[in-house]
Structure formats: C-alpha cells, structure tokens
C-alpha cells in the first residue's frame, strides 16, 4: 500500500487591513495528512483522525479538495486519509486551511500530478468551503507557499510571495476557553458590505505601508500597516480584549499587533527592541480581566507545505 504524508503550518490571515488578501505562515502549530492508496479499482475515501472532525469526505476540509481533484482530473482510487490535527480549531490560526494544504500536497505527490503551487491553493480552497461555506484563499495560500503572501487574484488564483527584509518573531495570544459555534461563518457575516470612503482610504494606506515595510525592512512602516479601520472594528464583540492587548504590545515596543484571521487569537510581532516578557505578563493579565484564559505561543515565520520523510 503506497502512502504519502505532508505537513502544513498554521497561519494568521488579514494582518490588519488585508482581509482575504494577506496571510503569514508560522511555526506555532502544524497539521499532518497521510494518504494511502488501498485499491485503484474502487472509488471511495475513508477518513480517520485524532480529532472530532467530519468523516464524510465532502464535509471534511482535508478530503473535499481531494474529491474535487479526482473529479476534475478523472482519478479513480480507494483512499485512506488520516488527518492528524495539531492546530487548534476555531482560534483563527488557519486550521482548516492547513489540513487542506497538507492533503492536496500529499495527493499531488502520491499521484505524481505536478500541480503548481497556485493549483494547490485553488484546490485547497475547497477545504474552506467544507469548513465554513466560503472559499477564502488567504490561509491556504500561506500554508502552501509559506512566509507572507498576498492573494492578488482568485479567478484565476494568483499568489505573490512578499519578500521579508526585517527580522521579527511572533507571539500568539490563544484563548483556551473561548468557543464560538461556526465562528468563521459568523465572523464573515459581521464584515460590513459597504464602507465609508475615509475608512477605505485609511485601509489602503495601511496595507501599502505594511507591504512596503516588509519589502524595505522598515519597522515603522510595518507598525503602521498592522492596523485596520473596517473588519477588526466590526468583529470586536468576538474579542473585546484585543484593543487592550494591542495597547500593551505597543507600550512595550512590539512592532505591532493585530487579530489573527477571524480571531479570537491575537498576533503580536516582536523584535530585539521588544520587552516580550512584559507583553506576555500584562497581556495574560488583560485576558484574565475578560475571563479569558490565554496561552501565549512564541513562533517564527514558517515555510510552505512539504512531504514528510523526504531527504
């Protein structure tokens, strides 16, 4: 029985004003997906997992992309798919996107399809449909490519890897006792359909500043860029502790802070100028004031999805 196993890292989407556009892959957590071919004369998928995820292929973020690849390319096979979840679900850390990215990578390698990275993203987006009903590309793009990415088009899929010329670390405040049913779907429904011209202009300035800051290696541009006037404000009821954690982060000279994806996790970028210990101490105290138990994870930028066991 031939098997392939792939690993994809967690990610934080949006990075302030880059809703559905920007995302960063980080080493905080990872998911692993193993796919084995049991019979090439049958056509079914059996799902196993260490987590309570849907076992029906069309409702599973790892296997629905595989179903779509098999349909489009015309592959017939009986598969056993084992999804090993390492990324906590519902915390805005790209859990479903990483599973989808790992699955399409393992399947691509198993059947020697030679799909491009952008094709992997296109298929992995079906995993987001299975998870939340929306094919948002930002998390899957980060998990596939690694680093910081910008999704500049979804039809066709076009992803640009952003050069990072400033060294930074990552702190993630991850709430342990916050559970929001169908969180991603609910959070997307909170995003306003129309915005004021002034908010649009400010957000355009922020995203420009962030990208230029990464490319030019300018700390103050990155700090300015990690702001948002639209989506974070609309979703604030989901993470009321965020403004104060951001205030603490800036007080102790973090580069900046933003909500990780749809939340409730908070992403803080730090460097040698930052007092990380104070941010962790006071940020955790802030969480407690809101009756939220936060675990703080330190991470770095992660690479893209890869096959495990390859020399």
Curated annotation (Swiss-Prot):
Sorted alphabetically, the Gene Ontology cellular component annotations on this record are: cytoplasm
Any one Gene Ontology molecular-function term assigned to this protein's record: homoserine kinase activity
From the broadest rank down, the organism's phylogenetic lineage runs: Archaea, Thermoproteota, Thermoprotei, Sulfolobales, Sulfolobaceae
Report keywords, A-Z.
Amino-acid biosynthesis, ATP-binding, Cytoplasm, Kinase, Nucleotide-binding, Threonine biosynthesis, Transferase
- Entry superkingdom: Archaea
- Where in the cell? Cytoplasm
Pathway, per UniProt? Amino-acid biosynthesis; L-threonine biosynthesis; L-threonine from L-aspartate: step 4/5
Q: Belongs to which family?
A: Belongs to the GHMP kinase family. Homoserine kinase subfamily.
Q: Which reactions is this enzyme annotated as catalysing?
A: L-homoserine + ATP = O-phospho-L-homoserine + ADP + H(+)
Q: What is the first-listed, main subcellular location in coarse terms? A: cytoplasm
Query: Pfam families this protein is in?
Result: GHMP_kinases_C, GHMP_kinases_N
Entries under InterPro entries matching the protein? GHMP_kinase_C_dom, GHMP_kinase_C_sf, GHMP_kinase_N_dom, GHMP_knse_ATP-bd_CS, Homoserine_kinase, Ribosomal_Su5_D2-typ_SF, Ribsml_uS5_D2-typ_fold_subgr
- The name under which this protein is listed is Homoserine kinase
Q: What does this protein do?
A: Catalyzes the ATP-dependent phosphorylation of L-homoserine to L-homoserine phosphate.
* Record EC number: 2.7.1.39
Q: Which residues are ATP-binding?
A: 88-98
- Identify the species of origin: Saccharolobus solfataricus (strain ATCC 35092 / DSM 1617 / JCM 11322 / P2) (Sulfolobus solfataricus)
Q: Does the keyword Nucleotide-binding apply?
A: yes
Biological process (GO) annotations held by this record are: threonine biosynthetic process
């Amino acid at each position: 029985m031939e098997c392939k196993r792939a690993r994809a890292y967690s990610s934080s989407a949006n990075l302030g004003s880059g809703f559905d556009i920007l995302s960063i892959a980080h080493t905080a957590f990872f998911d692993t997906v193993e796919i084995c071919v049991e019979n090439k004369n049958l056509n079914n998928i059996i799902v196993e997992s260490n987590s309570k995820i849907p076992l029906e292929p069309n409702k599973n973020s790892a296997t629905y992309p595989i179903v779509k690849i098999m349909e489009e390319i015309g592959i017939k096979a009986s598969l056993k798919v084992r999804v090993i979840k390492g990324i906590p679900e519902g915390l805005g850390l790209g859990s479903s996107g990483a599973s989808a990215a790992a699955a399409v990578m393992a399947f691509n390698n198993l059947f020697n399809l030679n799909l491009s990275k952008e094709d992997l993203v296109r298929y992995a987006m079906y995993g987001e449909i299975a998870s939340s009903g929306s094919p948002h590309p930002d998390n899957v793009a980060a998990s596939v490519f690694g680093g910081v990415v910008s999704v500049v088009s979804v039809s066709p899929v076009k992803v640009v890897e952003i050069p990072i010329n400033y060294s930074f670390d990552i702190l993630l405040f991850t709430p342990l006792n916050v559970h929001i049913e169908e969180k991603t779907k609910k959070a997307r429904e909170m995003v306003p359909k129309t915005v004021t011209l002034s908010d649009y202009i400010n957000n355009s300035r922020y995203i420009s500043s962030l990208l230029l800051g990464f490319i030019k290696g300018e700390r103050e541009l990155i700090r300015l860029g990690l702001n948002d006037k639209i989506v974070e404000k609309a979703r604030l009821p989901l993470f009321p502790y965020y403004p104060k954690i951001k205030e603490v982060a800036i007080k102790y000279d973090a580069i900046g802070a933003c909500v990780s994806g749809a939340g409730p996790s908070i992403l803080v970028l730090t460097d040698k100028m930052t007092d990380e210990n104070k941010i962790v101490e006071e940020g955790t105290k802030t969480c407690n004031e809101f009756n939220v138990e936060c675990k703080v994870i330190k991470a770095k930028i992660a690479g893209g999805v890869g096959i495990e066991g390859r020399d």
